[in-house]
């Protein structure tokens, strides 16, 4: 690598779509029984976040809709969506920018608040050297809907992640 790292966000930057909404849509389509469960868990998370003093915006950004999902299922669906839908939603400009950085021998890093299985699938497709997405260190079993202990915490932002990555590369 040339000593330069280029950091990218996913949704709205490289991808002209919401990867996590697309994943949630497929999950609901394939497992419709999850809709009332996901709605209830999201609502409970929203109310709980409001009671803890979070803003309405932050309270609404919870992962209750993914509660009781299996990490392996999310991985499989994410890979399928990247192959069939999301790869077509990456703009030509984004692909050209990534290609330019690759030609310059820059290290490419994806830093996103998207759930980790989707972030990893997109990073693999885009040829990223590293990826930081939302998820616990050990992604096995069933999701609870809580983000406690997850990487790339939404409330603290991506800056600490980028700073830590930059220090680790130096």
Q: What is the meaning of each model-derived region?
A:
Residues 1-3, 76, 83-170:
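C-terminal cap/substrate-recognition subdomain and adjoining C-terminal extension
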Residues 45-71, 126, 130-135:
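Short, compositionally biased "basic patch" segments
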């Amino acid at each position: 690598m040339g000593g330069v790292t280029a950091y990218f966000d996913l949704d709205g930057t490289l991808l002209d779509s919401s990867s996590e909404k697309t994943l949630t849509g497929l999950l609901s389509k394939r497992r419709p029984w999850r809709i009332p469960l996901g709605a209830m868990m999201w609502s409970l998370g929203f109310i709980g976040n409001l009671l803890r003093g979070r803003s309405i915006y932050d309270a609404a950004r919870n992962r209750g809709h993914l509660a009781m999902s299996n990490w392996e299922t999310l991985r499989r669906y994410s890979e399928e969506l990247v192959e069939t839908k999301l790869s077509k939603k990456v703009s030509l400009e984004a692909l050209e920018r990534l290609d330019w950085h690759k030609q310059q021998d820059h290290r490419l890093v994806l830093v996103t608040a998207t759930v980790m299985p989707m972030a990893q699938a997109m990073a693999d497709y885009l040829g990223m050297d590293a990826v930081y997405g939302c998820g616990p260190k050990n992604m096995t079993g069933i999701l609870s809907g809580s983000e406690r202990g997850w990487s790339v915490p939404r409330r603290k932002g991506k800056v600490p992640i980028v700073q830590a990555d930059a220090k680790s590369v130096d």
